[in-house]
Regions:
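Short-chain dehydrogenase/reductase
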Residues: 1-71, 85-91, 95, 249
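Active-site loop of short-chain dehydrogenase/reductase
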Residues: 45-46, 73-74, 122-136, 175-179, ...
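Conserved Rossmann-fold SDR core element
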Residues: 73-75, 163-169, 173-188, 224-231
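A short, exposed helix-loop element centered on a Lys and neighboring polar residues
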Residues: 115-116, 167
Length: 250
């Protein structure tokens, strides 16, 4: 919600917010399609809330068709959705291979499908921006086993695959105006992790920090120098002073 709302503050508001499905446990996640749409419209912009299932490719096709039918173009694609189903916190010998396959499909294969649907239109218009949400689970080993302050193999492996996409887009299409980034939000304080040891190890920032960073990446010419790289949203937000009042002065 914070990413969509902040991006609409900077741009023209043509965002389709997503949702997170968690098949392994019931969690309360702040925000919804309705509240995100309301936050956008409160800023005087239009919103088009569309439900989409990362495991259901036809629903992805339908979402893109609806957005293009309503507005005719997509200038920026922010892949912020994640699939957090069964197996994401399983250890190596406990990970069911069918669950691992779903994680890879939801967090890599079908998000690649979405990119393949959207980027050709960007190329026809001379360019566009793609922001892929990364994760520390894709770039580092856990500090401890899952359930003891670390994370499982399945989720990290699926995010590691997706991490390769932005750099590949940059290599293949930067000369044609495609500006692609990976963004690592760091630990975000509204994540409410069930693993208390994990929460103790990582201090977080509010989601508005990553929202401000992504809005800047999608709109600023200065951001082009970061294309093809992994951008850490919290240091970027602090360095560029993108969110007034953050970090708070002690």
């Amino acid at each position: 919600m914070a990413i969509a709302a902040r991006t609409v503050h900077e741009g023209d508001g043509r965002m389709a917010p997503g949702s997170v499905r968690d098949d392994q446990e019931t969690r309360v996640v702040e925000g919804s399609l309705e509240t995100t749409g309301a936050a956008i419209e409160a800023r005087g912009r239009r919103a088009l809330p569309v439900a989409m299932d990362l495991l259901d490719r036809p629903s992805i096709d339908a979402m893109v068709d609806r957005v293009l039918g309503e507005w005719g173009r997509i200038d920026a694609l922010v892949n912020n959705a994640i699939y957090q189903g069964a197996g994401r916190m399983d250890r190596v010998l406990e990970l069911d291979l069918d669950a691992a396959t779903k994680l890879v499909v939801g967090n890599y294969v079908n998000q690649l499908h979405l990119i393949q649907l959207v980027v050709p239109g960007m190329l026809e218009r001379g360019g566009g921006r793609v922001v892929n949400m990364a994760s520390a689970t894709a770039t580092m080993d856990p500090p401890a086993p899952a359930g003891e302050g670390g994370w499982g193999l399945g989720y990290g492996a699926s995010k590691a695959a997706f991490l390769r996409v932005a750099g590949q887009l940059h290599v293949e299409f930067a000369s044609q105006g495609i500006v692609a980034f990976n963004v690592d939000p760091g630990f975000t304080t509204n994540d409410k992790p069930s693993d208390e040891e994990f929460a103790k190890r990582f201090r977080g920032a509010p989601p508005e920090v990553t929202g401000a960073a992504i809005a800047w990446l999608c709109s600023s010419d200065d951001a082009i120098e970061l294309a093809g790289t992994l951008v850490y949203s919290q240091p970027l937000c602090k360095r560029r002073d993108l969110l007034p009042g953050w970090p708070p002065h002690v």
